[in-house]
Each structure stands twice: as C-alpha cells, then as structure tokens.
Amino acid sequence: VAEFIRAMGVDPGLAQTGYAVVEVSDKKGIARVWDTISTDPKDSMSKRLHKIFTDFEKIFKKWNVDILILEGIYVLPKYPNAALQLGAVKGVVSLAAAIENVEVRELKPTEVKMALTGNGRARKDQVERAVRKIFMFKDRIRSDHASDALALALVGLSRYGMIKW
C-alpha cells in the first residue's frame, strides 16, 4: 500500500472561501477536489462563520486531511474591516482543523505567487495558468478562490519537501 499525504489549501473569505485537497504519493501531487464555500451576504456574520465551520468539519472528515495550508491575511489599508472578517474566517477554519487534529500552516500570498510564477505580484490569471500547467488541467479553473487554494496546497507541500514539479 502506497503511503500518501493529503494537504488542503484554503483561500479564506467571508463571501467565498476556496479550498482544494491535494494528495501526494512519491512526490507527485494529484488534485482530488477543488471548490468554494459560499455564504449568503444577507445572513449575520455569526451564521456565515458557522456555515464555513460546519462545511470544513465535513470536508476534513471526508478527505482525512493531514495538513492545512492557509493563506495569510493580505488586506489593503483602506479596508480594515476586511482584515477582521478574514481573521474570523481563518479562526473557524483553524478550529475545524484542530478538532480533526490537522496541522495548520500559513503562507503569504506573495510567497505562493513567487514560487509558482517567479513574480510575487503575479496576477490571478498567471497563478491559475501555473497551477493548471502543474496539474496538467486542460480546462480553466472556474473559481479564482479554488485556483488560489490549489496554489496554496502545492506551494505548501513543496515548501515542506513533500512534492516536486
């Protein structure tokens, strides 16, 4: 039986949180699932956070994730409230991970962009193209959030010596 590790990349957001599970065996990565969790902007903050938490509880259980790679918070100074929202989302995702004994690590967006494209200020489409090339996807990844989550999982696994591309 081949040994493998499963990593989940998460691009946190209150409206949409991207996630992706990448399985690694023999230093090769296979994307198992990538998607977004959406919340209703009409709902209260606590209800939205609860939805994100319960969805991640289910995802961690279903995919038996070993390591979570969360995107670090990057917020423009003119949107300070966004930092608070992202921090809350990261908190509930981290809590769901802790309950399932999933190790949590964090990467800055600039680190991920630099590792995949050679440019720490790469655009979303450049990151998506790099991710598609590594996984040999023919079709464009529909969601930027899911694409970013795949990128986080890849770079996190690479950073810790578990994968090569």
Q: Each predicted region: which residue ranges?
A:
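Phosphate- and other anionic-substrate recognition elements at nucleic-acid/protein interfaces
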Residues: 1-165
